[in-house]
Amino acid sequence: MKFTHELIPFEELTATSTSSGRLYETPRGSYPSITTILGKQPDKQKGLQKWRDRIGHEKADRIANTAARRGTNIHEHLESYLMTEKLPLNEMPTTMAMFSQMKQVIDKNLEIINASEAPMYSDTLRVAGRCDLIGIWKGERAIIDFKTSSREKQRKYITDYFLQCTAYSMMFEERTQLPCKNIVVIIGCDETPMAQVFEAKRDDYVDDVKRIINDYHA
């Protein structure tokens, strides 16, 4: 599909991985990534540790590394497709299947691309990050995030995805002065024939995002 590109420029940011998480260098200093902040929530760290203890650390590392590699692969293919319409070649069947199911929902609903892999930050929140996609989705501007999963997701278990996108929306508005109130999370899933699509309103999560970020910086 040929997309309309009405690109909004963003200043590139240098990112560094540290022992405490990912940091972005902004004109006003180093800010942690929103994914780092969300991952540092006490309940998230406890849950992750319980999972690692239950299945064993070596197996947990293998699962995490495999998931990370596949996620990176899918993200790179989607970015290339969105910006150049090029399709991936010579990929593993499982990767192609996941890319194809995500491509289908994107082709159906995405009208205009404003930015892909956009580096953003907020001086107000003291947070930064890189947003997968910003564009016009079903007639309205939205923050669009790509996820991959081996299992089908339930909405009640993906609140952090909405929080992450809400933070991107707040960064976007601070940087551009343009409204962006909608969230779309697209999950490529091994268990489903089509990608899962979850839509939400940014304003439902703003207070929680502010609280979590303030707690992190306290």
Which stretches of residues belong to each language-model region?
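Metal-dependent nuclease catalytic cores that hydrolyze phosphodiester bonds in DNA/RNA
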Residues: M1-A128
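Mg2+/Mn2+-dependent nuclease catalytic core
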Residues: N114-A218
